[in-house]
């Protein structure tokens, strides 16, 4: 196993099975964040993640963290909160604001550089990247974004500026996703937060098998149309 240097003249990736064991999943470096390369990466179970100033690094970890939407864990306190939620939840109303929120709300620093913001905004304009927004009145207080692969959604990042805002985004999205034929959410790498919400780890080969099947599936044509998903009770 060795780290592969990508060419700017080809969007081809090596097999994820060749990724390093340490650091877990590191597969390649270099290339660019063009829409064609990003889409090729997601189709092969690969994603970019790197620190500012570093070369672009491409990953496919083993095991892979995923969330089956029907297994989303909602605590009793969250259920009570959601019944009286003050939030309105929308889809694809403010992609740019959501990714900017994810970039600026990370206390430990962020991998979401200006180049990353621009790259995913291009994917959004092409209809591949999508956002969920959480509003308190007219203020954006939380949200999440990711990349669609048929009936699989590759979650990238979320942020929260008010109580339970990001959890509300995920809860409402999961309900909508399941209801329209969505199957699986990719969480990339397990952490305490995603584990508390019901995410689990599966072998990379299983994830790649699911991806190869689900990316050929289809949600309704109007699923990603900008719309309101949830409004607070009057």
UniProtKB/Swiss-Prot annotation:
Signal peptide: none annotated. It catalyses: N-terminal L-lysyl-[protein] + L-leucyl-tRNA(Leu) = N-terminal L-leucyl-L-lysyl-[protein] + tRNA(Leu) + H(+); N-terminal L-arginyl-[protein] + L-leucyl-tRNA(Leu) = N-terminal L-leucyl-L-arginyl-[protein] + tRNA(Leu) + H(+); L-phenylalanyl-tRNA(Phe) + an N-terminal L-alpha-aminoacyl-[protein] = an N-terminal L-phenylalanyl-L-alpha-aminoacyl-[protein] + tRNA(Phe). It is an enzyme of class 2 (transferase). Disulfide bonds: none annotated. It comes from the Bacteria. Keywords: Acyltransferase, Cytoplasm, Transferase. The keyword Plastid does not apply. It is found in: Cytoplasm. GO terms for cellular component: cytoplasm. GO terms for biological process: protein catabolic process. The keyword Acyltransferase applies. GO terms for molecular function: leucyl-tRNA--protein transferase activity. Its EC number is 2.3.2.6. Belongs to the L/F-transferase family. NCBIfam families: aat. Functions in the N-end rule pathway of protein degradation where it conjugates Leu, Phe and, less efficiently, Met from aminoacyl-tRNAs to the N-termini of proteins containing an N-terminal arginine or lysine. This is Leucyl/phenylalanyl-tRNA--protein transferase. It comes from Escherichia coli O6:H1 (strain CFT073 / ATCC 700928 / UPEC).
